[in-house]
């Protein structure tokens, strides 16, 4: 897994004062990592097949009440209800923990299954206040709708998923799925990931403490 973080060189005026006593939006250049990888071999065909069966069996537990996702969607606690969903969630977390500028310990906050039928769609939305959101693609018929990130600096970014693909992206960026134009169903497992607070983590071992790199004392003056 390679992380590329190459900031764009842009000449900006300095010393811009910020407003006080109010919430205001500012344009700040921030790169947003998105990770796409096929993990079907890691998940295994057995687990992959069971995920599909569970999504089909569970059906639409929201009865189209979710306005942002107009498709059949399960409740958001599938990782607590089914060991298979927990297993795939844990695999995703192992990747997500390495995606930030510094490694952090994470856990699944939500996990669900989605089945898109013909003409189903998801309007642009985000999953704040989670850190990461993700999708693992269980069934992707030929001609399926892409996953779209509509607010890219250079235009819309598209992911045309394949069966077994995993897509991890920052939870606060908007994403959408255009209406499906194929007759076959499109299925995925979705999830959100949150940071584990330090108070919930075990104390480090003596060996881990020894391996901590001490900060440099050569301060720039």
Give residue ranges: language-model regions.
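Short, cationic low-complexity segments
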Residues: 209-221
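Positively charged, low-complexity intrinsically disordered regions
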Residues: 3, 21, 126, 208-212
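Alpha-helix boundary/capping detector
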Residues: 77, 190-193, 215
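Catalytic core of non-heme Fe(II) oxygenases with the double-stranded beta-helix
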Residues: 104-178, 184-188, 192, 196-199, ...
């Amino acid at each position: 897994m390679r992380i590329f973080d190459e900031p764009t060189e842009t000449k900006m005026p300095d010393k811009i004062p910020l407003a006080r006593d109010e919430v205001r939006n500012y344009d700040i250049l921030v790169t947003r990592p998105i990770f796409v990888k096929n993990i079907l071999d890691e998940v295994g065909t057995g687990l992959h097949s069971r995920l599909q069966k569970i999504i089909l069996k569970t059906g639409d537990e929201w009865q189209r009440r979710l306005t942002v996702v107009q498709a059949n969607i399960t409740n958001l606690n599938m990782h607590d209800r089914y060991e298979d969903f927990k297993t795939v969630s844990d695999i995703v977390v192992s990747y997500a923990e390495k995606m930030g500028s510094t490694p952090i310990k994470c856990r699944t906050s939500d996990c669900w299954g989605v089945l898109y039928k013909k003409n189903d769609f998801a309007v642009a939305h985000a999953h704040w206040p989670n850190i990461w959101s993700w999708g693992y693609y269980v069934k992707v018929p030929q001609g399926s709708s892409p996953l779209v990130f509509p607010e890219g600096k250079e235009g819309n970014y598209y992911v045309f998923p394949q069966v077994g693909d995993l897509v991890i992206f920052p939870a606060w960026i908007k994403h959408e799925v255009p209406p499906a134009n194929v007759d076959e169903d499109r299925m995925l497992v979705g999830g959100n990931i949150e940071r584990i607070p330090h108070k919930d983590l075990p104390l480090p071992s003596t060996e881990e403490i020894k391996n901590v790199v001490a900060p440099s004392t050569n301060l720039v003056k």
